[in-house]
Amino acid sequence: MTPNYKSVPIMEGPTVVKWDGIYYLFYSCNHFRNIDYSVGYATASNPYGPWTKHPNNPIIHKSIVGENGSGHGDLFKGFDGRYYYVYHVHNTGNNVVPRKTRIVPLIVTKGQDGIYSVTVDKDNVIVPTYE
């Protein structure tokens, strides 16, 4: 098993989208070598903040998607109209690099307060194949 890398608190790899007048900041936290590297998000009514972290963070983490070091990616809308998040994971349980790519469908649900809740369709993680 890879020793769990220790570092100062880190937030990096930001992506900001605006849905129905609210800004959503997706970010990665922890160091990429840490097995708990993960993705969370925060919301704000202004791109300058203040930002409010979502209470159900992280949305992508080894406990959710089943692989160490699951973080630092980007959001995109697929041809099917769904949102997806592409990210990387550790190579194996014993090696961080070279990292591998994963894509997970997002489940985006609008709450009564007008704020979208974002979770992942963890049973449908896409594992790209390379030729």
Q: How would you label these PLM feature ranges?
A:
Residues 1-131:
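Carbohydrate-active catalytic/glycan-binding domains of CAZyme proteins
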